[in-house]
Each structure stands twice: as structure tokens, then as C-alpha cells.
Amino acid sequence: MLKNDLFIRALKRQATPRTPIWVMRQAGRYLPEYRAVREKTDFLTLCKTPELACEVTIQPVDLMGVDAAIIFSDILVVNEAMGMNVEIIETKGIKLTPPIRSQADIDKLIDPDIDEKLGYVLDAIRLAKKELNDRVPLIGFSGAAWTLFTYAVEGGGSKNYTWAKKMMYREPKMAHQLLQKISDCISAYLVKQVEAGADAIQIFDSWASALSEDDYREFALPYIKQNVAAVKAAYPEIPVIAFAKDMNTILSDIADCGADAVGLGWNIDIAKARKELNDRVCLQGNMDPTVLYGTPEKIKSEAAKVLKQFGQHNDHSGHVFNLGHGILPDVDPANLKCLVEFVKEESAKYH
């Protein structure tokens, strides 16, 4: 039994005495303790060494007092498992070779055995679950098919998603074939993460806003639905968060994907999102990550604003406090600590 299950209860829109908080990229470069581990090895080796991945997963629980841990990994491990060569240089960016741009390229991608190709993530989850000793829940995650598709087709990050869009508009059948292949891998991977001990799942569609509303409904959302359905078919009790960054104009469609919670970027008032979705799902977010560059007073006032905008809870509301995207690497850890402590204290009056 979890000693602190506030995060899980909030995702399920059950009553909680206060609002739980965790932060995307909470295991990361802003922490000197993370940097000390990271200095010994490269980024992907850190992801692939269960003992080290476990250590950095737990750091923010010990140091910051967050209400959930998220397994330390990277969304691109899925691309690598499917046969792509992935290079991640934290300060310089990402390179995937060869880029997937033809039918022959798609045919070469493998349908991986998750235990074999991504066993290191599952081992890290098992280890972290054991080390956490039920203090807080552990989140497993994957990138969404659309986001992983953009990396595969572009061969890295992109401003305009030229190659990805070319395939979408010129060869939509081929695009869907690749998306489906990626989605099948994601579904299997997420189910395996729960099997290994993950208490909740988040699907990150980081590049969601590269698509128009209609294109998002066609090329992204159906695959998120598949991934959520796969988790729910195997583990109906496991809550799932869908984070389609900055797709604020179609929140209702995203809320219909079957996920328990919808993650919000910071460029929407959470009150608007709550009103539109009418407490059909839990909301996660959504303070601007750059607020953590501010003074303690400013951090508290901005956090108070998010809590106030969400407003008073009722019998079927849920809110998980988070940033609208990942914490930035040059933030002072004391500022995150300040945020976590403030949210824990301030949020009680809304419950």
C-alpha cells in the first residue's frame, strides 16, 4: 500500500486533503546530486544502467518532497528499440540515423521484444519501486506516436517538421503505417512498465502543437487512444495522463481519449480548461517553468494563482500541480523546494 497516494487519488478524482505536486524533468540537471551521477557517464548509459536510473529517479523525492517519482529515462528509447541509432548529447541535441523516409525504411524497423530491448527500463522501475518502499507512487511514461514519428522522420529535433509533414501530406498511408508501428511498440512498452511496478502512466506528446486541430485528430489522437486503451485493457485501475502540449483548442477531444488526466501547457488559464472539461478528467499543470527563475515571493504568488484559478474542489474534481513543461536545467533547486512546500500548504484550503 502506498503511504502517500494523493497523486493517484487526484488522478482518479477522489477526495484529497491537498493538491499533490510533482514536476516534469524533476530528476535532472538542475540538481547538483543528479549532475554528480551524470558526470560519471553519458546520458543514454545513465538511462540504461538500472542502479543509476533508480538513484536519480528517487533524488527529487528525497530532496524536494514531491508526491510522485517518475522513472528516469528518455522518450527516444522506443525509437532505439525499433532499430534506429539514437545519439543524445544533452547540450547539443539529438540525432537519429538513418531517418525514416521511405517504405523500405519503415519495413526495416523491428517490432521489438520489450523485455529484451527495453528491459533496462523495466529493471529500473522494479528497482525504484523497491527502493521507494511505497513512499510515493512511481510514474512510467512514453512519448506519443506523433512525437516519436517526428524524431524518426526528421532524424532529430525540428523547427518546421518539414520531412514529417511531407510524409503526412504526400504519403498519408505511409505516415499512418509508421505511426501504427510506433504506436504498437508504445502500447506494449507501457503495459510492460505497469507490469514492472509503475503506479501511473504519462504519455508525452511534446510536439503536439506542430499540428493543426484536424491533423492532430487524424495523425496523433487515434494513437494516444490506442495506447490508453492498451493500458486500461490490461490494468483498468492504473491511471493514465495524456499530455498533448499546447493543444488547448481541442482539450475536449483529448479528454475523450480515455485518459484519467489531461496535462496542460502554461499558455491556458486552468480555470478555462476546468470549465470546458467540467471535471470529466483530472487536470495536471500548469505553471510556466520560467517562474522558477523568480524570487520566492513571485514563485508563491504565481503558484497561488494557479491554485486559485483551478478553484474549490468538489466530489469529482482532480488537480495535480505541475509545471506546463519540464523544469529548466539552470533553476536553483531551492526554488523548486519553495514551490513544493508552498503548494502543499496553500492548496489545503481548496479541498
From Swiss-Prot:
Keywords: Cytoplasm, Decarboxylase, Lyase, Porphyrin biosynthesis
GO-annotated biological processes: protoporphyrinogen IX biosynthetic process
CDD domains, sorted: URO-D (cd00717)
Any one GO CC term of the record: cytosol
EC number: 4.1.1.37
EC class (word): lyase
Cross-referenced Gene3D superfamilies: 3.20.20.210
Pfam families tied to this protein: URO-D
Family recorded in the similarity comment: Belongs to the uroporphyrinogen decarboxylase family.
Protein name (record): Uroporphyrinogen decarboxylase
